[in-house]
């Protein structure tokens, strides 16, 4: 089965319950060059800049060899252009690149809201308001998005394209491609490919330096985002590429290829503001 066919094998029917094994993609070798991108959070311009750098790097390092860009979830919310980013990701990738997007906790929250809009949803206070604004859904002058649920649902139906909902529903929870890629991390007491969606999307304990590797990892790496820091970094068997793009103005990726050491690529907005991801 070729790469294009593998990338079409995503689950149907939406998000699985958090306690169940999360569906993912198991890519057979030989593995292409992989560029794993951290949390974009609606910073569409930064992602476009980073993808141009990835194209340049791929051509310099690998010539015409196709590469895979893996986006590790939390593509949306907080930043200014979540809708534009999804439009860009749904468009064909440049020659020589394929894109695969994984689910993050913000995609899960957004999907829950967009499926059944609720003006009381916590998502609105965690970047969801910026996502709605990117679709042209204006807040009520007095109540913001805390408007009647029926009105909010009508606005969502009128402004959010069905293709964007299908995109969110089709996001896999993990990828195996010589290394294990996910949004937040893994639990050491479960098999590598038997992680729960709750762990893959929401785990914070993964920042513990003493955390054991999950069973079955071998000499591979777990590549993730979710826990923002000023710069992407490797810590033993883990690589965190979340550099807090919406707060720092810095979006990071890591290049992985058999036989090569991991290498980081960065796209930045001018002088970055003080680091804060509260």
Protein language model features and the residues they cover:
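Acidic, His/Gly-enriched loop-helix segments that form or flank divalent-metal centers
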Residues: 133, 141-240, 244-250, 256-270
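Active-site neighborhood of phospho(di)ester-bond hydrolases with catalytic His/Asp-centered motifs
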Residues: 37-38, 69-73, 100-105, 220-227, ...
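Active-site neighborhood of divalent metal-dependent phosphoester bond hydrolases
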Residues: 65, 78-170, 203-213
